[in-house]
């Protein structure tokens, strides 16, 4: 910096003694005649013109001022002193990036700190001048009285009409730094570099900044907190839209389409045509059992042509072909056949009573209709249960899968085989409640019970004719 003394007052210059002379002469020496006009002209004229003319004439003035011994001196007794220097204190003496940013600020280039530097530095890593006297004010600055301590670098608020600034907004001062300890710039010559250099920025400021080529004026930057955090709300909405999609991704949407597995229908002809699946329906289980009341009922797997709507599905079967059991040389037992359908056959619901009638406690949603019709064209019978249809079909086909192990007699129904075996063993599990007579079949017991009912009715008629009912007596009381 160039510091010049104020030479406007001539009285102040004449009052200072001469510096650097060995002996001061009490009275002014007489100058040569060639310098007389200059000496006579100085008291009311220019001192610099007189000094230069005196030194250029013979050098006596200069020699007399700097050599020891008595010598003539100028009448003013003044010396001109000045200094020209540049006081530059580097912000980071050992940081190449700081030097690069300093030179960029001087040359008018906008610094662009990389992501590594922005991530490694903390918000408190602000550009403070290095050195022991960095925090002291500049004693040689002429504008010390007007502005003692300018604002710190991060608090230099941009104003409209100022030079253009690129990429980032000025960051607010950290809360940990006290306002009284803010460091001034190193020197007034580095104000341009200080305005260009910026400290590390917050992540949302880095995200909200544009590309390096888009530079705008400082007047376009926003300094309000609402404007600073507007980009944060946008980023949060983007993250929520990614983490919580409104619909399934592409592969999942292709695998699970809406309405693909709601309902399925089974065509009547899916189980095969003809009598290929009929032996499997007519084949009884391995053990003995009956469909009547004696030994339980044989409930075969119902045909899979039963649809939810209760439509006929067995009407397409053709029973004109002979079965395996009816062929000559057959053992009477149908050969097992693989199921034609991949879906398991659903079992029909067992009724409390026969004939398709439910009890009073039954809450069946479907109407009580006989959905299982005989597929034979000449037969018009229909049944409410599939096992009843299976027993009926054996009448048309003549299939007798149940054989007695004692006499090798074949039967079309399991209950018939059960009662036949009791004839060989002599078992009579059913006993009359009135007389105690025992029977081998339940239907025989029912027929016998009707005999007792008729006898009771005749006895009551006799007592009524005798007048016992008028006295309040009955046949049971007698």
From Swiss-Prot:
Q: What Pfam families is this protein classified in?
A: zf-C2H2
For the keyword Zinc, the answer is yes
Write down the superkingdom of origin: Eukaryota
Q: Name one GO cellular component term.
A: nucleus
InterPro entries tied to this protein = Znf_C2H2_sf (IPR036236), Znf_C2H2_type (IPR013087)
Tell me the segments the record calls region Disordered. 275-302
Q: Where does the protein principally reside?
A: nucleus
Q: Which UniProt keywords apply?
A: DNA-binding, Metal-binding, Nucleus, Repeat, Transcription, Transcription regulation, Zinc, Zinc-finger
Phosphoprotein as a keyword? no
Which SUPFAM superfamilies does the annotation name? beta-beta-alpha zinc fingers
Residue spans with biased composition (Gly residues)?
286-296
Write one Gene Ontology MF term. DNA binding
Query: In which compartments does the protein localize?
Result: Nucleus
Start-end of C2H2-type zinc fingers: 372-396, 402-424, 430-452
Q: What does this protein do?
A: Transcriptional regulator. Recognizes and binds to the DNA sequence 5'-GCGGGGGCG-3' (GSG). Activates the transcription of target genes whose products are required for mitogenesis and differentiation.
| Family per similarity comment | Belongs to the EGR C2H2-type zinc-finger protein family.
Q: What is this protein called?
A: Early growth response protein 4
Q: Which species is the source of this protein?
A: Mus musculus
Which gene underlies this protein? Egr4
């Amino acid at each position: 910096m160039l510091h010049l003394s104020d030479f406007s007052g001539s009285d102040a210059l004449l009052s200072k003694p001469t510096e650097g002379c060995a002996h001061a002469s009490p009275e002014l020496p007489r100058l040569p005649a060639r310098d007389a006009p200059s000496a006579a002209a100085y008291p009311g004229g220019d001192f610099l013109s007189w000094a230069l003319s005196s030194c250029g004439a013979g050098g006596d003035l200069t020699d007399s001022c700097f050599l020891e011994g008595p010598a003539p001196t100028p009448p003013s007794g003044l010396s001109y002193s000045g200094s020209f220097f540049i006081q530059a204190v580097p912000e980071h003496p050992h940081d190449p990036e700081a030097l690069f940013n300093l030179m960029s600020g001087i040359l008018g280039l906008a610094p662009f700190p990389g992501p590594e530097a922005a991530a490694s530095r903390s918000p408190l890593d602000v550009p403070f001048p290095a050195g022991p006297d960095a925090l002291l004010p500049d004693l040689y600055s002429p504008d010390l009285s007007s502005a003692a301590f300018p604002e710190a670098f991060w608090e230099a608020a941009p104003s409209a009409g100022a030079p253009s600034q690129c990429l980032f907004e000025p960051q607010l001062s950290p809360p940990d730094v006290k306002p009284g300890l803010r460091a001034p710039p190193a020197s007034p010559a580095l104000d341009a570099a200080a305005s260009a250099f910026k400290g590390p920025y917050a992540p949302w400021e880095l995200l909200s900044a544009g590309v390096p080529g888009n530079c705008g004026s400082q007047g376009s930057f926003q300094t309000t907190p609402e404007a600073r955090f507007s980009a944060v709300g946008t980023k949060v909405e983007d993250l929520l839209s990614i983490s919580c999609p409104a619909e399934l991704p592409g592969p999942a949407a292709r695998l699970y389409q809406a309405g693909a597995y709601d309902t399925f229908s089974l065509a009547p002809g899916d189980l095969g045509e003809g009598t290929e699946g009929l032996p499997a329906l007519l084949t009884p289980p391995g053990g003995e059992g009956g469909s009547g009341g004696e030994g339980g009922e044989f409930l075969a797997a119902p045909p899979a042509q039963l649809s939810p709507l209760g439509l006929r599905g067995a009407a397409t079967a053709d029973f004109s072909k002979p079965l395996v059991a009816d062929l000559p040389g057959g053992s009477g037992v149908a050969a097992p056949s693989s199921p034609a359908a991949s879906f398991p056959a659903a079992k029909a619901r067992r009724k409390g009573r026969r004939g398709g009638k439910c009890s009073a406690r039954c809450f069946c949603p479907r109407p009580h209709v006989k959905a299982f019709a005989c597929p034979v064209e000449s037969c018009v019978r229909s049944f409410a249960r599939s096992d009843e249809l299976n027993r009926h079909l054996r009448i048309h086909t003549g299939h007798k899968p149940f054989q007695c192990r004692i006499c090798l007699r074949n039967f079309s129904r399991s209950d018939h085989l059960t009662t036949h075996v009791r004839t060989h063993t002599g078992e009579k599990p059913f006993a009359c409640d009135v007389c105690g007579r025992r029977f081998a079949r339940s239907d025989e017991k029912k027929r016998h019970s009707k005999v007792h009912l008729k006898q009771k009715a005749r006895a009551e008629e006799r007592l009524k004719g005798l007048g016992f009912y008028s006295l309040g007596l009955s046949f049971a009381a007698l």
